[in-house]
Amino acid sequence: MCTVTYIPLGNSDFILTSSRDIPFSRERAEHPRIMEEDGVELCYPKDGKAGGTWIGVSEKKRLICLLNGGFEYHTSRTKYAKSRGLIVKELLKTNDLNEGFQKVDLENVEQFTLTIVDWHKELELIEFVWDGTKKHIKSMLQDPHIWSSSTLYDKSVKKLRRDWFSKWQKDNVILSLSTPLKTSSVEGSQKSILDFHHNAGMGDAFIDVMMNRGLGGTVSITSIKKENNQLSMYYEDVFTKEKSVIQIS
């Protein structure tokens, strides 16, 4: 997994959307719900196998989204110390994110990339990459971004997807970050990016954003929208067509 897009909307608002690409044989995830763990309120879809998650938000005013793999393709081993989805929950619950980065134990944890949005003070976009040996932490500009998992997509396909995303930006009005958005504008942006996650590509299911490689592909789409002080999570099961929206705050 997976494909992730980020759209800043101004006024510390944003939309982050994730397409989850996994083997079709993996246990189906539970739809997201709000729960309390270790005294912290979280909202996330629960992985059907390991009990972790690939995307979630917490009362710490933080969103974390997981992509399998670091900077480049790697060959997985049969066993690791901990599921990467549990790392997501651990960092969602920590009080101090920078301290959490330093303390999180990643020995014998498979490579991964985290896209993190934090608005505890001001809106921050952070990329955290574990390459299997070293932690890489990068503060990102508040611009539209797209990430594609290194375990599924090589550099040429990643570039193709960046090109598709650039075209999407040109075809859709991305308002100035200093301009307050009306509700209709935010909803329109979310509808449009969901359409991108459903339809972007070149008619090749092997590399299109809605991916299908026979034994695996896109199983769900999650879109988290922050509009003023309101936070919501949209979730869609690609196979059952079941959809749910949770108002988190």
Residue spans for each PLM region:
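N-terminal nucleophile
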Residues: M1-S249
